[in-house]
Amino acid sequence: MAIKMRLQRFGVHKRPFYRVVASESKNARDGKFLEILGTYDTILDIVELDHNKAQKWLSNGAQPTKTVKKVFKKSKFVAKNKTKFEK
């Protein structure tokens, strides 16, 4: 099963708020997830990310989406070992 690190949309109309989650790639965007890794507020540009959890999922083979890679850069997340994320 392929694990993706992606965003789940929350909030109200024209006021989105996202959770960074690890979920199976077959699940819907706002569907079932395995673990919450952090939050991202696009309006206030605030990123709260648990770096230890993100590192754990990357080392287990989870693939971040393009948007989650950008969120990682905003939160100054650096992977400890070489993973596919850095390539």
UniProtKB/Swiss-Prot annotation:
GO biological process, one term: translation
Species this chain originates from: Aster yellows witches'-broom phytoplasma (strain AYWB)
InterPro entries in UniProt: Ribosomal_bS16, Ribosomal_bS16_dom_sf
Record family assignment: Belongs to the bacterial ribosomal protein bS16 family.
The entry's keywords: Ribonucleoprotein, Ribosomal protein
Keyword flag DNA-binding: no
Gene of this entry: rpsP
Any one Gene Ontology molecular-function term assigned to this protein's record: structural constituent of ribosome
HAMAP family, sorted: Ribosomal_bS16 (MF_00385)
Phylogenetic classification of the source organism: Bacteria, Bacillati, Mycoplasmatota, Mollicutes, Acholeplasmatales
Name this polypeptide is given: Small ribosomal subunit protein bS16
Gene Ontology CC: one annotated term: small ribosomal subunit
The organism's place on the tree of life at top rank: Bacteria
